[in-house]
Amino acid sequence: MLGILDGISFRAEAGKTLAIVGESGCGKSVASLAIMGLLPENAEVSGSARLMGRDLLGMSAEERRALRGAEMAMIFQEPMTSLNPAFTAGEQVAEALRLHQRLDRDAAFKAAIAMLEKVRIPDAARRARQYPHQLSGGMRQRVMIAIALACRPKLLIADEPTTALDVTVQAQILALLDDLKRETGTAVILITHDLGVVADHADDVVVMYAGRVAEQARAADLFARPEHPYTVGLLGAAPAAGMRGERLASIEGTVPDLRAPPPGCRFAPRCPFAIARCAEGAPPLTEVAPGHFSACLRAPLDGMLGVAA
């Protein structure tokens, strides 16, 4: 059995955005699919995931299915493959309303048009009758957001929701999510690898590495004072505005193979601060400042940054 996630824990609060960041393959999307109950049947999940006090992992598949779309929803990376090409945009938004709010066909379609207006699709009544291939990438993603928020879910998971969009549309989509979050009080889990997006839109941050949580903090605290060497490396590798002709910083080494992960801290083979004890056991997630947690034996890192061990 291949272990993808190992002892992760986080909390998303109503009306706030929790960003989960990390390199590709670190387990960000797997964690979200586990919450939604969308992992393959042969996946084994242990622990608990609670929504408004209810244990999602203890529910039957039928009970979890009833919650999806009604009380928890997810926006995927690529709207063109997530939307059904055989149905119009309005029909796909209306489907959620008919299923979960028991509206008749006409009432659901009218509500769908109103929802498309809410996500700022111009001429929503006409666009509601168009098929996904007739819409731009930005409009398709807005339709996905309309579907996800149609029933005012308590939790919205946005998995790299702007990856396929240009920078201008990306900013519009993220601003829209912020506005709708404040309006509805929905808790948002934003999965991304873009630290600029995290800085602008997240309230809290979880940094993941190789299936484990490396650091967890308020967004402002994490950017001001990172307390895990991996986070330090991520922030150092982010290109600064106006950089020209300079070599980009990088984190030496490669992500470990989860089929045979290194003992102890999984970042130790790449860490400039690693000591022998780092390979002896998985470091616990420890509070190094109020509300700021790090899974590093050498945290807090005061006085160490910029100096290898």
Residue positions per predicted region:
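Short catalytic/signature loops enriched in Gly
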Residues: 122-126, 216-309
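ABC transporter nucleotide-binding domains
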Residues: 1-226, 236, 300-309
